[in-house]
């Protein structure tokens, strides 16, 4: 099997598992997971906008092997954040998402999405429809990072519930 084929089969499966575990991980682990993910995204975008897009949306154009693009320290931090989050999702401080939390997350994210819509106009739709982003890979990567930077600037509890809401819509 080619490395690319293996990446394209396994990455979406890992992502699906992580998204489901994020729903049960404590706030601090959820926020750390997303911070590590965004640190990795920024580093991959320095390699190329196309690599960044493939990293964020492996299902659209095929994924990338981050091990080939990132320094060992960054990969280690990311893998540690992933492992901590997955473990904590089964731990004694396991989180349960409530309807009230989901509703609060919608309110928390509304001003962020409005600010992005004001800045990017119709292109904001690429966040929901990355398959339409051909030729706009840089813009897509920039918008994703700007959105998560704004979310991660929220207090931890709010940031965690927005992250859980956003990834629950990917499941």
Q: Each predicted region: which residue ranges?
A:
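Alpha-helix capping and helix-coil boundary motifs
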Residues: 1-7, 26, 48, 98-101, ...
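Structured segments of extracytoplasmic/periplasmic soluble domains
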Residues: 13-20, 112-119, 154
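Generic structural signal for hydrophobic core residues of well-folded globular domains
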Residues: 18-22, 37, 60-63, 89, ...
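Extended amphipathic alpha-helical interaction segments
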Residues: 42-131
